[in-house]
């Protein structure tokens, strides 16, 4: 079979790396891919942007692609799944209407309220004055979210009223997030521990993936601004068997059934970003309509099932006939980022010390990289995700940091404490 993976991040490198291990996969293309996918002997990059739907469609038709897996949110929100399905091509992902679960924070909050799915108290605003009045009524800490897509960075957790007012002004009166910020959601600050709960959905049936925990803040000890994610590990010990069942019953099933009831049948990866409080009650912070990045990297390292087989079953509405097998060992991924990220950073720096062959119990997944002649250069803020397995989270952490040691470029940095919550539970 011919498989097409759309995207150019670490998530897509991990999905393509896992897809090509399938006995069903004859060729795996990645559009546009990165240096990591270019250097994988079994993968082929295709120079088409992830959001150029007409060109992707033409390529899929010409190459007779049997299955397309969409990595990032942007093509989903502009309707790539609708376009491929109309052309009779198998594609795993939600339709444009269903992708509103990620594409609009306001849509999601209203949906959660309609279906009594636990979430933070909130209100939507498009005007500065009512938003400021609401802030003053509620006080800080409080959370301000840009309504549209902002690459995982459109959320401000304001610890003071001044920070909150500045965020509202920046988004609604200024242009901090462009069109994405012209409508905002203000919601209560939730206390607890976060977890990423990702499932595969075929419209009716659900197959849970392994749980994981992301590290959003740029600095050690969860300090500094939010990023797209500085590292992750799987599984997340905060999600006990009991909490897992609670999430399925209170969040996942009501979401899948609620979307279907409203005429937006959901297919694809569904990622619930959760806050779990001290009583074990989960609340939805956000939905993403795709796999998380960097959570995909440790999850794919642990997945022992055939990813292509699972995606095909989902496209056929037969996920109820499938189970997923996992390496019992935890996996942990550390993101190496460009100096200055998540603010301004340079690109085009040569990366030194990348492993020349496959490493035991680990994998260096590429994100913001490109190949120029034979040099691997930086091409984004989050550049690599160095991922490893271990007998416990501490061992996986030790192995991942060992693998990062030889790798460097001008200004590169990483958090030194990925996995600390799981390790501190011991």
Where do the language-model regions lie?
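ATP-binding N-terminal substructure of ATP-dependent carboxylate-amine bond-forming enzymes
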Residues: 1-97
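Solvent-exposed alpha-helices and their adjacent loops that cap or buttress functional pockets
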Residues: 21-23, 38-39, 62, 92, ...
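Short acidic-hydrophobic, aromatic-tinged amphipathic segments that line or gate anion-handling sites
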Residues: 45-51, 123-127, 158
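A conserved helix-loop-beta module that forms one wall/lid of the active-site cleft
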Residues: 92-154
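Internal nucleotide-binding/catalytic subdomain
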Residues: 154, 158-296
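Active-site "cap" helix and flanking loop/linker of ATP-utilizing ligase/carboxylase catalytic domains
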Residues: 248-270, 288-359, 372
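Generic C-terminus detector
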Residues: 369-373, 378-426
């Amino acid at each position: 079979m011919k498989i097409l993976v759309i995207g150019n991040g670490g998530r897509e490198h991990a999905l393509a790396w896992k897809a090509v291990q399938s006995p069903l996969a004859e060729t795996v293309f990645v559009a546009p891919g990165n240096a990591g996918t270019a250097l994988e002997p079994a993968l082929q990059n295709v120079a088409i942007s992830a959001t150029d739907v007409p060109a992707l469609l033409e390529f899929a038709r010409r190459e007779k692609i049997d299955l397309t897996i969409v990595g990032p949110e942007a093509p989903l929100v502009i309707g790539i799944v609708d376009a491929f399905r109309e052309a009779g091509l198998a594609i795993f992902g939600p339709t444009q209407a269903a992708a509103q679960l990620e594409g609009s924070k306001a849509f999601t909050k209203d949906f959660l309220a309609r279906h009594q799915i636990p979430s933070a108290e909130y209100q939507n605003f498009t005007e500065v004055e009512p938003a400021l009045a609401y802030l003053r009524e509620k006080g800080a800490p409080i959370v301000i979210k840009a309504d549209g897509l902002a690459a995982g960075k459109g959320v401000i957790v304001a610890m003071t009223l001044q920070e909150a007012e500045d965020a509202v002004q920046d988004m609604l009166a200024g242009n901090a997030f462009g069109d994405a910020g012209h409508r905002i959601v203000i919601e209560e600050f939730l206390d607890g521990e976060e977890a990423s709960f990702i499932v595969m959905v075929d419209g009716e049936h659900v197959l849970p993936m392994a749980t994981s925990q992301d590290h959003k803040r740029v600095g050690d000890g969860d300090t500094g601004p939010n990023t797209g994610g500085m590292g992750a590990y799987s599984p997340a010990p905060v999600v006990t068997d009991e909490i897992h069942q609670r999430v399925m019953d209170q969040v996942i099933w009501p979401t899948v059934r609620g979307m279907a009831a409203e005429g937006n049948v959901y297919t694809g990866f569904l990622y619930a970003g959760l806050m779990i409080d001290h009583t074990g009650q989960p609340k939805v912070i956000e939905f993403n309509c795709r796999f998380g990045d960097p959570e995909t990297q440790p999850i794919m390292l642990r997945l022992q099932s055939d990813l292509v087989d699972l995606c095909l079953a989902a496209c056929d509405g037969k996920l109820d006939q499938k189970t997923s097998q996992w390496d019992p060992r935890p996996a942990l991924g550390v993101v190496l980022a460009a100096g200055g990220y998540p603010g301004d950073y340079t690109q085009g720096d040569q990366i030194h010390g990348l492993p020349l062959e496959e490493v035991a119990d680990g994998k260096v997944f590429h994100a913001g990289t490109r190949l120029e002649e034979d040099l691997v250069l930086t091409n984004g803020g989050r550049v690599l995700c160095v991922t490893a397995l271990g007998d416990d989270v501490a061992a996986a952490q030790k192995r991942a940091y060992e693998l990062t040691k030889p790798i460097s470029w001008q200004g590169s940095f990483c958090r030194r404490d990925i996995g600390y919550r799981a390790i501190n539970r011991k």
